[in-house]
């Protein structure tokens, strides 16, 4: 679980050389998003969490995010139009990419690592107006995985999980469907 969570966010941030002087928005603060915040902060980027859930602000700040924006608050969202260099999109629910593309500055990159069940609908002018890019990331290899593990060990970066007994798997599923998990459930193999 740690490898999946970490690699899906580490690899694109490294590929696009996100770091000091960059403004990174992490869209969604769940299993992938919380690792994206940790990596973004450790790479030296200014990290903002974009979330539909205002109750996640305290978690975002605890993880090191510099800013937090509730995406349902149109005025707050407008205040960051054209602001970000990168958006790392970890959301697996359907959402409007055009809205988030407007938050990118010139040459900004929106990187999708979440996988919604329906296709994205994107207007051409959401991209061409500012020479913006829409990208995805799900690749890497053993050398990069080892690099990530070494980096995490050196910087004390770990995934936040809740360990559960196998007998509680149905309760964990119900909680997951309600969005009540910080940030992944892991089954204690000793409980099998």
Task: Report the location of each language-model feature.
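Adenosine-nucleotide cofactor-binding segment
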Residues: 20-29, 41-99
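A glycine-rich, Thr/Ser-enriched phosphate-binding loop motif common to dinucleotide/cofactor-binding enzymes
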Residues: 1-15, 27-35
């Amino acid at each position: 679980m740690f490898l999946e969570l970490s690699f899906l966010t580490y690899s694109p941030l490294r590929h696009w050389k996100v770091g000091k002087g960059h403004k990174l928005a992490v869209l969604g603060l769940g299993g992938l998003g919380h690792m994206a915040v940790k990596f973004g902060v450790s790479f030296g980027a200014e990290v903002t969490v974009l979330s539909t859930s205002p109750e996640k602000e305290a978690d975002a700040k605890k993880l090191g995010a510099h800013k937090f924006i509730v995406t349902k608050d149109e005025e707050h969202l407008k205040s960051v139009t054209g602001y970000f260099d990168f958006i790392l999109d970890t959301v697996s629910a359907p959402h409007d990419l055009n809205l988030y593309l407007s938050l990118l500055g010139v040459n900004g990159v929106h990187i999708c690592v979440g996988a919604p069940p329906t296709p994205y609908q994107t207007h051409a002018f959401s991209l061409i107006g500012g020479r913006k890019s829409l990208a995805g990331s799900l690749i890497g290899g053993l050398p990069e995985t080892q690099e990530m593990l070494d980096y995490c060990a050196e910087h004390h970066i770990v995934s936040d999980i809740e360990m559960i007994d196998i007998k509680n798997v149905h309760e964990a599923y119900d909680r997951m469907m309600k969005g009540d998990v910080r940030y992944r459930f892991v089954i204690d193999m000793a409980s099998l």
